[in-house]
Curated annotation (Swiss-Prot):
NCBIfam families: PRK00504.1 (NF001764), PRK00595.1 (NF001860), rpmG_bact (TIGR01023). Keywords: Chloroplast, Plastid, Ribonucleoprotein, Ribosomal protein. This is Large ribosomal subunit protein bL33c. The keyword Cell membrane does not apply. The keyword Ion transport does not apply. GO terms for cellular component: chloroplast; ribonucleoprotein complex; ribosome. PANTHER family: 50S RIBOSOMAL PROTEIN L33, CHLOROPLASTIC, LARGE RIBOSOMAL SUBUNIT PROTEIN BL33C. The gene is rpl33. It is found in: Plastid, Chloroplast. Its main location: plastid. Belongs to the bacterial ribosomal protein bL33 family. It comes from the Eukaryota. GO terms for biological process: translation. One of its GO terms (molecular function) is structural constituent of ribosome.
Amino acid sequence: MAKGKDIRIIVILECTCCVRKGVNKELLGISRYITQKNRHNTPNRLEFRKFCRYCQKYTIHGEIKK
């Protein structure tokens, strides 16, 4: 049986471009993705290039706190 905290946790990735701009004026919203990460293999914050439907391009999505 596993002891201690769960190794795999659910994290939320948020578009860093939308956050910096203060959200687009035409379409209100910030692009977010939900994924999992392994705490032992990746203790640092995740960053992926994903498509942002509000910016209409591929941008860096970084992990945020819950």
